[in-house]
């Protein structure tokens, strides 16, 4: 296999962008494991008392990820996130203002392999979220297990990540002052198995939990489409029904996370590696769908609102797909 090496002479700014994405990839794929190893080493070293003190802190702080987390505007505004967003680049586009007196549930589509667009747009200020949506506080939902990892939990909470359990959503959407925006990758980990360049298959037809949540709390729904999200990595062919796909689906049910076999590019070559390819991501935030508070919604009400959400998502796709390199005759695939 021929390896396509990067040229030696490229602008220094591009080097900085690559370094920014490299640190993100390492932290996303290996930081949790390193933090666990560090804690164990600390526990069995002469500094064991520090591990013990942190263990006490962890016990006392256990519920924080389900109570709004502990965001840090300083961390969200690090210059590294500006270079991170410029690498692809990632662009956040607002199609309608969102009144901060309401709470919102933003349905993010598609999940992609590593949810790059959601992280860049809602966990950092690299694309100017606070400027585009003044008064709103974004919270990207993440699997609860990651918030049990020592040290790592502090880092991810600083970027506005919160636990995806029900109590976490209930806490944020119950804030009467408004201005809370929950960002949910609706397709979840299973959708990562369909993340392939040029394809856009969304697992949405049977996803109604976020709809019920919106009705229960009267949170307005906002469809969000991230064009280009699936183009960042190549994935081993895994059609539904194949041995590989069946194995991946079984492991996902057991582990709670998807295990797509993917590759991108390297630091000094473009042929293979764990860095995402430099391909643009355009994250389009649609118009809000007003939702009246219904503490005990019926199945009919849930189905009706779900159908409206799907229709608005299709409309968003149809309106914008031609602007971002998608053939106008290509339809959105929902399953």
From Swiss-Prot:
Gene Ontology cellular component annotations, sorted alphabetically: endoplasmic reticulum membrane; perinuclear endoplasmic reticulum membrane
Reactions listed under catalytic activity: a 2-acylglycerol + an acyl-CoA = a 1,2-diacylglycerol + CoA; a 2-acylglycerol + an acyl-CoA = a 1,2-diacyl-sn-glycerol + CoA; a 2-acylglycerol + an acyl-CoA = a 2,3-diacyl-sn-glycerol + CoA; a 1-acylglycerol + an acyl-CoA = a 1,2-diacylglycerol + CoA
Membrane topology listed for this record: Multi-pass membrane protein
Chief location category: endoplasmic reticulum
Coiled coil: none
Enzyme superclass (EC): transferase
EC number: 2.3.1.20, 2.3.1.22
One of the record's GO molecular function terms: 2-acylglycerol O-acyltransferase activity
Source domain of life: Eukaryota
Pfam families documented for this protein: DAGAT (PF03982)
Pathway assigned to this chain's UniProt record: Glycerolipid metabolism; triacylglycerol biosynthesis
Keywords (A to Z) from UniProt: Acyltransferase, Cytoplasm, Endoplasmic reticulum, Glycerol metabolism, Glycoprotein, Lipid biosynthesis, Lipid metabolism, Membrane, Transferase, Transmembrane, Transmembrane helix
Transmembrane segments: 24-44, 104-124
GO biological processes: glycerol metabolic process; monoacylglycerol biosynthetic process; triglyceride biosynthetic process
Cellular compartments annotated: Endoplasmic reticulum membrane; Cytoplasm, Perinuclear region
PANTHER family named in the record: ACYLTRANSFERASE, DIACYLGLYCEROL O-ACYLTRANSFERASE
Described function: Catalyzes the formation of diacylglycerol from 2-monoacylglycerol and fatty acyl-CoA. Involved in glycerolipid synthesis and lipid metabolism. Catalyzes the formation of diacylglycerol, the precursor of triacylglycerol, by transferring the acyl chain of a fatty acyl-CoA to a monoacylglycerol. Plays a central role in absorption of dietary fat in the small intestine by catalyzing the resynthesis of triacylglycerol in enterocytes. Has a preference toward monoacylglycerols containing unsaturated fatty acids in an order of C18:3 > C18:2 > C18:1 > C18:0 at sn-2.
Family: Belongs to the diacylglycerol acyltransferase family.
Name used for this protein in its record: 2-acylglycerol O-acyltransferase 2-B
Species of origin: Xenopus laevis
Highest classification ranks of the organism: Eukaryota, Metazoa, Chordata, Craniata, Vertebrata
Gene: mogat2-b
